[in-house]
């Protein structure tokens, strides 16, 4: 049965298709729906409000209702909190699966530091709350550093994807230089940073939402 992804940008559908292909998923494993208006509403309101949360949750539940849909994956970090309001147990946050990966890494290596990068100001609070809640130990959040990269989202919104990728890549290198053991790209739109990563000083490839979410779903299928 297919996975249905709800996106707020057409480019995110391409990213998930690329990630699925790299993981060896069969063609047509993912069905995509794009609702740009939901993110535009959130940005106009300065973030998620109660009405938009309810609206988004209702759409997600409706998408999950058909029996032939295995799971619904919300790929927009800004809208992520709406998943908590869903009635269906088939709805997942893509960035939530990445957050659990980070929590597991911190549990394995209690001394490591992880840098979280976001770009859209409207996603900062939702991302912070998500990753802190995913941690298993009380003080693990002290080893997380969340940065909203200044100016990056404006580049994305202008359609300057090469400039956006360059800005996020520079931020990732700076995070490693500051002592991070792992950089985590918390928005799907940043996938290109990892895809074209040129390692410096053996720094690991940053973790991405799409690959982490699909890997987690693949494990759940076993």
Feature locations, PLM:
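Non-catalytic structural scaffold of enzyme domains
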Residues: 1-222
């Amino acid at each position: 049965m297919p996975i249905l992804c709800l996106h707020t940008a057409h480019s995110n559908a391409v990213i998930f298709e690329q990630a699925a292909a790299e993981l060896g998923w069969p063609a047509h494993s993912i069905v995509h729906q794009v609702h740009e208006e939901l993110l535009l509403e959130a940005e106009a309101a300065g973030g998620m409000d109660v009405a938009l949360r309810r609206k988004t949750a209702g759409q997600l539940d409706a998408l999950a209702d058909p029996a032939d849909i295995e799971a619904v994956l919300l790929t927009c970090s800004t809208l992520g909190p709406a998943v908590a309001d869903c009635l269906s147990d088939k709805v997942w946050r893509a960035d939530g699966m990445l957050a659990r990966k980070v929590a597991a890494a911190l549990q394995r290596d209690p001394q490591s530091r992880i840098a979280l990068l976001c770009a859209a100001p409207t996603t900062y609070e939702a991302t912070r709350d998500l990753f802190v809640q995913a941690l298993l130990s009380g003080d693990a959040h002290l080893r997380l550093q969340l940065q909203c990269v200044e100016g990056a989202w404006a580049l994305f919104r202008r359609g300057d994807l090469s400039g956006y990728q360059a800005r996020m890549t520079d931020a990732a290198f700076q995070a490693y230089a500051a002592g991070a053991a792992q950089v985590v790209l918390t928005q799907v739109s940043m996938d290109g940073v990892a895809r074209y990563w040129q390692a410096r000083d053996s720094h690991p490839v940053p973790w991405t939402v799409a690959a982490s979410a699909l890997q987690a779903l693949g494990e759940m299928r076993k």
